[in-house]
Protein backbone atom coordinates (compact mmCIF):
# COMPACT_ATOMS: atom_id res chain seq x y z
CA UNK A 1 0.00 0.00 0.00
CA UNK A 2 2.12 2.86 -1.34
CA UNK A 3 0.03 5.65 0.21
CA UNK A 4 -0.29 4.03 3.63
CA UNK A 5 -0.19 6.58 6.45
CA UNK A 6 0.21 6.51 10.20
CA UNK A 7 -2.36 7.98 12.56
CA UNK A 8 -0.15 11.03 13.09
CA UNK A 9 0.38 11.58 9.38
CA UNK A 10 -3.36 11.49 8.72
CA UNK A 11 -4.15 14.10 11.38
CA UNK A 12 -1.18 16.25 10.32
CA UNK A 13 -2.08 16.21 6.62
CA UNK A 14 -5.70 17.11 7.38
CA UNK A 15 -4.59 20.27 9.20
CA UNK A 16 -2.06 21.81 6.82
CA UNK A 17 -3.15 25.32 5.90
CA UNK A 18 -0.08 26.26 3.89
CA UNK A 19 3.33 24.78 3.04
CA UNK A 20 5.57 27.61 1.82
CA UNK A 21 8.70 26.33 0.12
CA UNK A 22 11.67 26.40 2.47
CA UNK A 23 9.53 27.23 5.50
CA UNK A 24 7.76 25.30 8.24
CA UNK A 25 4.17 24.37 7.32
CA UNK A 26 1.27 26.26 8.86
CA UNK A 27 -1.26 23.99 10.59
CA UNK A 28 -4.77 24.71 11.84
CA UNK A 29 -5.56 24.43 15.55
CA UNK A 30 -8.98 23.03 16.50
CA UNK A 31 -8.85 23.55 20.26
CA UNK A 32 -6.76 25.92 22.36
CA UNK A 33 -6.63 25.38 26.12
CA UNK A 34 -5.27 28.13 28.36
CA UNK A 35 -4.57 28.57 32.06
CA UNK A 36 -3.46 31.35 34.37
CA UNK A 37 0.32 30.88 34.19
CA UNK A 38 1.30 30.92 30.51
CA UNK A 39 -1.45 33.15 29.10
CA UNK A 40 -1.12 36.67 30.63
CA UNK A 41 1.67 37.88 28.33
CA UNK A 42 -0.10 36.40 25.32
CA UNK A 43 -3.29 38.35 25.99
CA UNK A 44 -1.23 41.47 26.73
CA UNK A 45 0.41 41.12 23.33
CA UNK A 46 -3.00 41.03 21.66
CA UNK A 47 -4.09 44.16 23.51
CA UNK A 48 -0.94 46.06 22.54
CA UNK A 49 -1.39 45.08 18.89
CA UNK A 50 -5.12 45.81 18.94
CA UNK A 51 -5.98 42.28 17.82
CA UNK A 52 -9.03 40.17 18.57
CA UNK A 53 -9.22 36.39 18.89
CA UNK A 54 -9.58 34.59 15.58
CA UNK A 55 -11.95 31.99 17.04
CA UNK A 56 -12.85 32.65 20.69
CA UNK A 57 -15.31 29.74 20.66
CA UNK A 58 -12.38 27.35 20.16
CA UNK A 59 -10.46 28.61 23.19
CA UNK A 60 -11.19 27.23 26.67
CA UNK A 61 -9.67 28.50 29.90
CA UNK A 62 -9.37 27.26 33.45
CA UNK A 63 -7.45 28.00 36.63
CA UNK A 64 -5.35 25.13 37.94
CA UNK A 65 -1.60 25.64 38.45
CA UNK A 66 -1.64 28.27 41.19
CA UNK A 67 -5.01 27.60 42.79
CA UNK A 68 -5.44 26.50 46.38
CA UNK A 69 -6.63 22.98 47.11
CA UNK A 70 -7.70 24.00 50.61
CA UNK A 71 -10.09 26.85 49.79
CA UNK A 72 -11.87 28.25 46.74
CA UNK A 73 -11.44 31.76 48.11
CA UNK A 74 -9.15 34.25 46.40
CA UNK A 75 -7.91 35.15 49.87
CA UNK A 76 -6.27 31.71 50.06
CA UNK A 77 -3.93 32.57 47.19
CA UNK A 78 -0.50 34.16 47.31
CA UNK A 79 -0.32 37.70 45.89
CA UNK A 80 1.21 36.43 42.63
CA UNK A 81 -1.30 33.60 42.27
CA UNK A 82 -4.19 35.96 42.92
CA UNK A 83 -2.89 38.37 40.31
CA UNK A 84 -2.63 35.56 37.77
CA UNK A 85 -6.14 34.19 38.29
CA UNK A 86 -7.69 37.66 38.36
CA UNK A 87 -5.80 38.58 35.19
CA UNK A 88 -7.05 35.44 33.44
CA UNK A 89 -10.62 36.22 34.48
CA UNK A 90 -10.35 39.75 33.09
CA UNK A 91 -8.70 38.58 29.86
CA UNK A 92 -11.39 35.98 29.28
CA UNK A 93 -14.06 38.63 29.85
CA UNK A 94 -12.34 41.10 27.50
CA UNK A 95 -11.83 38.58 24.70
CA UNK A 96 -14.98 36.46 25.04
CA UNK A 97 -13.26 33.25 26.14
CA UNK A 98 -15.16 30.56 28.04
CA UNK A 99 -13.66 30.31 31.54
CA UNK A 100 -13.96 27.61 34.18
CA UNK A 101 -12.88 29.63 37.21
CA UNK A 102 -12.25 28.44 40.76
CA UNK A 103 -15.96 28.65 41.57
CA UNK A 104 -17.17 26.71 38.52
CA UNK A 105 -18.31 23.12 39.21
CA UNK A 106 -16.28 21.89 36.22
CA UNK A 107 -13.05 23.71 37.14
CA UNK A 108 -9.99 21.52 37.27
CA UNK A 109 -6.65 20.60 35.79
CA UNK A 110 -6.81 21.57 32.14
CA UNK A 111 -5.82 18.09 30.94
CA UNK A 112 -8.49 16.44 33.09
CA UNK A 113 -11.28 18.93 32.49
CA UNK A 114 -10.87 19.11 28.69
CA UNK A 115 -11.47 15.43 27.96
CA UNK A 116 -14.32 14.99 30.43
CA UNK A 117 -16.20 17.91 28.85
CA UNK A 118 -15.77 16.49 25.36
CA UNK A 119 -13.55 19.39 24.29
CA UNK A 120 -10.95 16.79 23.30
CA UNK A 121 -12.01 14.92 20.16
CA UNK A 122 -10.32 12.40 17.83
CA UNK A 123 -8.56 13.77 14.78
CA UNK A 124 -8.21 17.29 16.14
CA UNK A 125 -5.13 19.42 16.78
CA UNK A 126 -5.02 20.65 20.37
CA UNK A 127 -2.47 22.99 21.92
CA UNK A 128 -1.93 24.49 25.36
CA UNK A 129 0.83 26.43 27.06
CA UNK A 130 1.70 23.38 29.11
CA UNK A 131 4.14 20.54 28.45
CA UNK A 132 1.70 17.75 29.31
CA UNK A 133 -0.80 18.65 26.60
CA UNK A 134 0.17 15.29 25.08
CA UNK A 135 -2.45 13.82 27.43
CA UNK A 136 -5.18 14.53 24.87
CA UNK A 137 -3.46 12.30 22.33
CA UNK A 138 -5.18 9.39 24.07
CA UNK A 139 -8.21 10.25 21.93
CA UNK A 140 -6.36 10.15 18.63
CA UNK A 141 -5.79 13.90 18.70
CA UNK A 142 -2.48 15.56 17.87
CA UNK A 143 -1.85 17.46 21.09
CA UNK A 144 1.29 19.24 22.22
CA UNK A 145 2.52 22.03 24.45
CA UNK A 146 3.48 25.48 23.17
CA UNK A 147 5.27 28.54 24.51
CA UNK A 148 3.67 31.84 25.48
CA UNK A 149 4.58 33.55 22.19
CA UNK A 150 2.88 30.68 20.37
CA UNK A 151 -0.14 31.01 22.66
CA UNK A 152 -0.49 34.58 21.41
CA UNK A 153 -0.11 33.46 17.79
CA UNK A 154 -2.84 30.81 18.14
CA UNK A 155 -5.17 33.26 19.86
CA UNK A 156 -4.69 35.69 16.97
CA UNK A 157 -4.69 33.30 14.00
CA UNK A 158 -5.87 29.84 15.13
CA UNK A 159 -2.77 28.48 13.38
CA UNK A 160 0.84 27.56 14.13
CA UNK A 161 4.03 27.05 12.17
CA UNK A 162 5.29 23.56 12.89
CA UNK A 163 7.89 21.22 11.47
CA UNK A 164 6.63 17.71 10.82
CA UNK A 165 7.92 15.17 13.33
CA UNK A 166 9.25 11.69 12.75
CA UNK A 167 7.03 8.74 13.67
CA UNK A 168 7.60 6.10 16.33
CA UNK A 169 5.47 3.08 17.18
CA UNK A 170 5.62 1.75 20.72
CA UNK A 171 3.83 -1.58 20.86
CA UNK A 172 3.05 -3.18 24.20
CA UNK A 173 2.16 -6.75 23.39
CA UNK A 174 0.01 -9.08 25.47
CA UNK A 175 -1.64 -8.25 28.76
CA UNK A 176 -0.40 -6.96 32.09
CA UNK A 177 -0.60 -8.98 35.28
CA UNK A 178 -2.53 -8.01 38.42
CA UNK A 179 -1.30 -4.87 40.13
CA UNK A 180 0.20 -3.37 36.98
CA UNK A 181 -1.39 -0.15 35.74
CA UNK A 182 -1.08 2.34 32.90
CA UNK A 183 1.42 4.30 35.02
CA UNK A 184 3.62 1.23 35.29
CA UNK A 185 3.42 0.66 31.54
CA UNK A 186 4.57 4.16 30.66
CA UNK A 187 7.29 4.21 33.32
CA UNK A 188 8.57 0.90 31.98
CA UNK A 189 8.63 2.38 28.47
CA UNK A 190 10.60 5.42 29.62
CA UNK A 191 12.94 3.16 31.55
CA UNK A 192 13.58 1.20 28.36
CA UNK A 193 14.14 4.04 25.86
CA UNK A 194 15.29 6.79 28.21
CA UNK A 195 14.31 10.42 28.63
CA UNK A 196 15.50 11.31 25.13
CA UNK A 197 14.43 8.15 23.33
CA UNK A 198 11.43 9.87 21.77
CA UNK A 199 13.10 13.17 20.88
CA UNK A 200 11.96 14.37 17.47
CA UNK A 201 9.11 11.87 17.26
CA UNK A 202 5.37 11.72 17.63
CA UNK A 203 4.74 8.38 19.32
CA UNK A 204 1.81 6.09 18.63
CA UNK A 205 1.13 3.69 21.49
CA UNK A 206 -0.48 0.43 20.42
CA UNK A 207 -0.68 -3.28 21.16
CA UNK A 208 -3.07 -5.39 23.21
CA UNK A 209 -2.03 -3.85 26.53
CA UNK A 210 -2.77 -0.33 25.29
CA UNK A 211 -6.05 -1.34 23.65
CA UNK A 212 -7.16 -2.91 26.94
CA UNK A 213 -6.72 0.36 28.83
CA UNK A 214 -9.62 2.62 29.73
CA UNK A 215 -9.52 6.20 28.46
CA UNK A 216 -8.17 7.23 31.85
CA UNK A 217 -5.33 4.76 31.44
CA UNK A 218 -4.57 5.88 27.91
CA UNK A 219 -4.44 9.49 29.10
CA UNK A 220 -1.88 8.49 31.73
CA UNK A 221 0.32 6.89 29.06
CA UNK A 222 0.08 9.80 26.61
CA UNK A 223 0.56 12.32 29.42
CA UNK A 224 4.09 11.05 29.96
CA UNK A 225 5.08 10.90 26.28
CA UNK A 226 6.86 14.20 26.86
CA UNK A 227 8.96 12.51 29.56
CA UNK A 228 10.56 10.32 26.91
CA UNK A 229 11.31 13.42 24.84
CA UNK A 230 8.46 12.97 22.35
CA UNK A 231 6.60 15.87 20.74
CA UNK A 232 3.31 14.09 21.37
CA UNK A 233 1.79 10.71 22.11
CA UNK A 234 -1.27 9.23 20.40
CA UNK A 235 -3.59 6.24 20.64
CA UNK A 236 -5.93 5.37 17.78
CA UNK A 237 -9.60 5.99 18.63
CA UNK A 238 -11.81 2.93 19.03
CA UNK A 239 -15.06 1.90 20.69
CA UNK A 240 -13.59 2.65 24.12
CA UNK A 241 -13.01 6.22 22.92
CA UNK A 242 -16.48 6.60 21.44
CA UNK A 243 -18.20 5.24 24.54
CA UNK A 244 -16.27 7.70 26.72
CA UNK A 245 -17.18 10.71 24.57
CA UNK A 246 -20.85 9.92 23.97
CA UNK A 247 -23.12 12.52 25.57
CA UNK A 248 -20.35 14.81 26.82
CA UNK A 249 -21.05 18.54 26.63
CA UNK A 250 -18.91 19.49 23.64
CA UNK A 251 -19.02 16.16 21.81
CA UNK A 252 -21.14 15.96 18.63
CA UNK A 253 -24.82 15.20 19.14
CA UNK A 254 -27.60 13.37 17.27
CA UNK A 255 -26.91 12.97 13.53
CA UNK A 256 -23.59 14.77 13.94
CA UNK A 257 -22.51 12.02 16.32
CA UNK A 258 -22.98 9.24 13.78
CA UNK A 259 -21.11 11.24 11.16
CA UNK A 260 -18.28 11.98 13.58
CA UNK A 261 -17.87 8.34 14.64
CA UNK A 262 -17.75 7.25 11.01
CA UNK A 263 -14.89 9.70 10.43
CA UNK A 264 -13.10 8.79 13.66
CA UNK A 265 -13.09 5.10 12.73
CA UNK A 266 -10.95 5.97 9.71
CA UNK A 267 -8.36 7.77 11.83
CA UNK A 268 -6.01 4.88 12.39
CA UNK A 269 -2.69 3.74 11.01
CA UNK A 270 -3.05 1.99 7.67
CA UNK A 271 -1.77 -1.52 7.13
CA UNK A 272 1.64 -1.21 5.57
CA UNK A 273 2.39 2.23 6.99
CA UNK A 274 6.06 2.60 7.87
CA UNK A 275 7.29 4.16 11.11
CA UNK A 276 10.70 5.78 11.47
CA UNK A 277 11.29 3.82 14.67
CA UNK A 278 9.64 0.88 16.43
CA UNK A 279 9.87 -0.14 20.09
CA UNK A 280 8.34 -3.33 21.47
CA UNK A 281 7.61 -4.44 25.02
CA UNK A 282 5.99 -7.54 26.47
CA UNK A 283 3.30 -6.49 28.94
CA UNK A 284 3.76 -9.67 30.98
CA UNK A 285 7.30 -8.56 31.82
CA UNK A 286 6.15 -5.29 33.40
CA UNK A 287 5.94 -5.14 37.19
CA UNK A 288 4.78 -2.20 39.33
CA UNK A 289 7.35 0.55 38.74
CA UNK A 290 9.09 2.99 41.06
CA UNK A 291 11.60 5.72 40.21
CA UNK A 292 14.82 5.80 42.24
CA UNK A 293 16.50 8.92 40.81
CA UNK A 294 15.84 12.40 39.53
CA UNK A 295 14.24 11.76 36.15
CA UNK A 296 11.43 9.41 35.06
CA UNK A 297 13.88 7.21 33.16
CA UNK A 298 15.66 6.27 36.38
CA UNK A 299 13.13 3.61 37.27
CA UNK A 300 13.07 -0.04 38.34
CA UNK A 301 10.49 -2.65 39.31
CA UNK A 302 9.27 -2.63 42.90
CA UNK A 303 10.93 -6.00 43.53
CA UNK A 304 14.27 -4.64 42.34
CA UNK A 305 17.11 -2.68 43.91
CA UNK A 306 18.62 0.76 43.51
CA UNK A 307 21.10 0.27 40.64
CA UNK A 308 24.84 0.66 41.10
CA UNK A 309 26.49 3.36 38.95
CA UNK A 310 29.69 1.28 38.93
CA UNK A 311 27.89 -1.23 36.71
CA UNK A 312 27.23 1.46 34.09
CA UNK A 313 29.78 1.49 31.26
CA UNK A 314 28.85 4.90 29.86
CA UNK A 315 30.77 7.59 31.83
CA UNK A 316 28.11 10.25 31.29
CA UNK A 317 25.29 7.97 32.42
CA UNK A 318 27.36 6.81 35.39
CA UNK A 319 27.96 10.40 36.48
CA UNK A 320 24.25 11.18 36.12
CA UNK A 321 23.37 8.19 38.28
CA UNK A 322 25.87 9.19 40.95
CA UNK A 323 24.52 12.72 41.06
CA UNK A 324 20.94 11.44 41.28
CA UNK A 325 21.74 9.09 44.15
CA UNK A 326 23.51 11.85 46.05
CA UNK A 327 20.47 14.13 45.72
CA UNK A 328 17.85 11.49 46.38
CA UNK A 329 19.74 10.16 49.42
CA UNK A 330 19.83 6.47 48.50
CA UNK A 331 22.59 3.89 48.29
CA UNK A 332 23.15 1.44 45.45
CA UNK A 333 21.81 -2.02 46.25
CA UNK A 334 18.98 -0.82 48.51
CA UNK A 335 15.80 -2.87 48.10
CA UNK A 336 13.05 -0.62 46.77
CA UNK A 337 10.68 -1.99 49.41
CA UNK A 338 13.06 -0.79 52.14
CA UNK A 339 12.66 2.87 51.16
CA UNK A 340 10.58 4.79 53.71
CA UNK A 341 8.50 7.85 52.84
CA UNK A 342 6.93 10.65 54.87
CA UNK A 343 4.72 12.29 52.22
CA UNK A 344 2.25 10.96 49.65
CA UNK A 345 0.63 12.86 46.81
CA UNK A 346 -2.19 11.31 44.80
CA UNK A 347 -3.20 13.68 42.02
CA UNK A 348 -1.86 15.61 38.97
CA UNK A 349 -2.83 15.53 35.29
CA UNK A 350 -1.25 12.06 35.17
CA UNK A 351 -3.28 10.30 37.84
CA UNK A 352 -6.19 12.28 39.34
CA UNK A 353 -9.14 10.83 37.45
CA UNK A 354 -11.92 8.73 38.95
CA UNK A 355 -10.28 5.43 37.98
CA UNK A 356 -7.09 6.53 39.72
CA UNK A 357 -8.91 7.43 42.92
CA UNK A 358 -10.82 4.15 42.91
CA UNK A 359 -7.54 2.27 42.55
CA UNK A 360 -5.99 4.15 45.46
CA UNK A 361 -9.08 3.73 47.64
CA UNK A 362 -8.78 -0.06 47.43
CA UNK A 363 -5.52 0.18 49.38
CA UNK A 364 -6.77 2.84 51.79
CA UNK A 365 -10.05 1.16 52.75
CA UNK A 366 -10.05 -0.14 56.30
CA UNK A 367 -6.46 0.95 56.87
CA UNK A 368 -4.72 3.95 58.42
CA UNK A 369 -2.01 6.22 57.10
CA UNK A 370 1.22 5.26 58.84
CA UNK A 371 2.51 7.34 61.73
CA UNK A 372 4.67 10.21 60.55
CA UNK A 373 3.23 10.18 57.03
CA UNK A 374 1.17 13.01 55.53
CA UNK A 375 -0.92 11.96 52.54
CA UNK A 376 -3.12 14.12 50.34
CA UNK A 377 -5.59 13.20 47.62
CA UNK A 378 -6.35 15.89 45.05
CA UNK A 379 -9.07 15.10 42.48
CA UNK A 380 -8.32 16.42 39.01
CA UNK A 381 -11.56 18.33 38.52
CA UNK A 382 -14.88 19.29 40.02
CA UNK A 383 -16.51 16.44 38.13
CA UNK A 384 -14.02 13.90 39.46
CA UNK A 385 -14.46 15.21 43.00
CA UNK A 386 -18.26 15.02 42.78
CA UNK A 387 -18.16 11.49 41.35
CA UNK A 388 -15.70 10.31 43.99
CA UNK A 389 -17.86 11.74 46.75
CA UNK A 390 -20.97 10.14 45.25
CA UNK A 391 -19.15 6.81 45.46
CA UNK A 392 -17.98 7.46 49.01
CA UNK A 393 -14.30 7.47 48.10
CA UNK A 394 -13.72 10.68 50.03
CA UNK A 395 -14.94 9.00 53.21
CA UNK A 396 -12.61 6.05 52.64
CA UNK A 397 -9.64 8.37 52.31
CA UNK A 398 -10.60 10.62 55.21
CA UNK A 399 -11.27 7.69 57.57
CA UNK A 400 -7.85 6.29 56.66
CA UNK A 401 -6.18 9.60 57.50
CA UNK A 402 -5.66 11.05 54.03
CA UNK A 403 -6.46 14.71 53.38
CA UNK A 404 -9.24 15.21 50.80
CA UNK A 405 -8.66 18.38 48.80
CA UNK A 406 -10.17 20.63 46.11
CA UNK A 407 -9.16 20.20 42.44
CA UNK A 408 -5.91 21.65 41.13
CA UNK A 409 -2.36 20.87 40.02
CA UNK A 410 -1.34 20.89 43.67
CA UNK A 411 1.90 19.18 44.69
CA UNK A 412 2.92 18.18 41.17
CA UNK A 413 5.02 21.34 41.05
CA UNK A 414 6.18 23.82 43.68
CA UNK A 415 4.08 26.66 42.27
CA UNK A 416 1.36 26.80 44.90
CA UNK A 417 1.03 26.20 48.64
CA UNK A 418 1.13 22.40 48.29
CA UNK A 419 4.84 21.67 48.35
CA UNK A 420 7.38 19.51 50.08
CA UNK A 421 10.01 20.66 52.55
CA UNK A 422 13.70 19.98 52.09
CA UNK A 423 14.46 16.36 52.93
CA UNK A 424 10.89 15.13 52.50
CA UNK A 425 10.56 11.86 50.59
CA UNK A 426 7.33 11.57 48.64
CA UNK A 427 5.48 8.79 46.86
CA UNK A 428 3.89 10.79 44.06
CA UNK A 429 1.52 9.93 41.22
CA UNK A 430 2.71 12.92 39.20
CA UNK A 431 4.94 12.88 36.11
CA UNK A 432 8.26 14.48 37.06
CA UNK A 433 10.78 13.70 39.79
CA UNK A 434 13.35 16.36 38.92
CA UNK A 435 15.45 17.99 41.63
CA UNK A 436 13.25 20.47 43.51
CA UNK A 437 10.18 19.73 41.40
CA UNK A 438 7.90 19.43 44.45
CA UNK A 439 9.86 21.87 46.59
CA UNK A 440 13.45 22.88 47.21
CA UNK A 441 15.44 19.88 48.45
CA UNK A 442 12.45 17.53 48.07
CA UNK A 443 12.84 13.92 46.94
CA UNK A 444 10.20 12.45 44.65
CA UNK A 445 9.44 8.85 43.69
CA UNK A 446 6.95 8.37 40.84
CA UNK A 447 4.43 5.56 41.27
CA UNK A 448 0.88 4.55 40.40
CA UNK A 449 -2.06 5.62 42.61
CA UNK A 450 -2.32 2.10 44.05
CA UNK A 451 1.38 2.06 44.91
CA UNK A 452 1.16 5.52 46.46
CA UNK A 453 -1.80 4.62 48.67
CA UNK A 454 -0.12 1.40 49.76
CA UNK A 455 3.05 3.30 50.66
CA UNK A 456 0.97 5.75 52.70
CA UNK A 457 -0.43 3.04 54.95
CA UNK A 458 2.79 1.01 55.14
CA UNK A 459 5.13 3.96 55.61
CA UNK A 460 7.41 2.57 52.92
CA UNK A 461 7.13 1.25 49.39
CA UNK A 462 5.51 -2.17 49.06
CA UNK A 463 4.85 -4.66 46.30
CA UNK A 464 1.08 -4.41 45.98
CA UNK A 465 0.99 -7.82 44.33
CA UNK A 466 1.78 -9.37 47.71
CA UNK A 467 0.16 -9.11 51.16
CA UNK A 468 1.51 -6.24 53.24
From Swiss-Prot:
Keyword Lyase attributed: yes
Oligomer status and interactors: Heterodimer of LeuC and LeuD.
Reactions listed under catalytic activity: (2R,3S)-3-isopropylmalate = (2S)-2-isopropylmalate
GO MF term (any one): 4 iron, 4 sulfur cluster binding
Listed EC numbers: 4.2.1.33
GO biological process: L-leucine biosynthetic process
Enzyme class: lyase
Keywords, alphabetical: 4Fe-4S, Amino-acid biosynthesis, Branched-chain amino acid biosynthesis, Iron, Iron-sulfur, Leucine biosynthesis, Lyase, Metal-binding
Protein family membership: Belongs to the aconitase/IPM isomerase family. LeuC type 1 subfamily.
Known role: Catalyzes the isomerization between 2-isopropylmalate and 3-isopropylmalate, via the formation of 2-isopropylmaleate.
InterPro entries documented for this protein: 3-IsopropMal_deHydase_lsu, Acnase/IPM_dHydase_lsu_aba_1/3, Acoase/IPM_deHydtase_lsu_aba, Aconitase_4Fe-4S_BS, Aconitase_4Fe-4S_dom, IPM_dehydratase_rel_enz, IPMI_cat
Cofactor: [4Fe-4S] cluster
List of residues binding [4Fe-4S] cluster: 349, 409, 412
Official protein name in the record: 3-isopropylmalate dehydratase large subunit
CDD domains documented for this protein: IPMI
Superkingdom per UniProt: Bacteria
Gene: leuC
Upper lineage: Bacteria, Pseudomonadati, Pseudomonadota, Gammaproteobacteria, Alteromonadales
Pathway(s) annotated for this protein in UniProt: Amino-acid biosynthesis; L-leucine biosynthesis; L-leucine from 3-methyl-2-oxobutanoate: step 2/4
Note describing how the cofactor binds: Binds 1 [4Fe-4S] cluster per subunit.
Amino acid sequence: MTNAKTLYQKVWDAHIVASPEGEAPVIYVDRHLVHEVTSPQAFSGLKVAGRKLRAPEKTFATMDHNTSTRSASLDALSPMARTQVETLAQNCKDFGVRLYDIHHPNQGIVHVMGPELGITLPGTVIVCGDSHTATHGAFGALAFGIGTSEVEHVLATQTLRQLKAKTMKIEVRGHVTDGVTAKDIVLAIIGKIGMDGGTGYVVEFCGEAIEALSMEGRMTVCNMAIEMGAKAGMVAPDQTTFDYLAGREFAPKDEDWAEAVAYWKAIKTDDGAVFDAVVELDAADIAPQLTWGTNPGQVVAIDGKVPDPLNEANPSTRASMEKALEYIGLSAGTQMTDISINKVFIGSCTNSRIEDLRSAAVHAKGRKVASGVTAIVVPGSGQVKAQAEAEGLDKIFIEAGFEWRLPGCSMCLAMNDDRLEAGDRCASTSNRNFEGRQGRGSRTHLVSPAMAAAAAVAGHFVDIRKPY
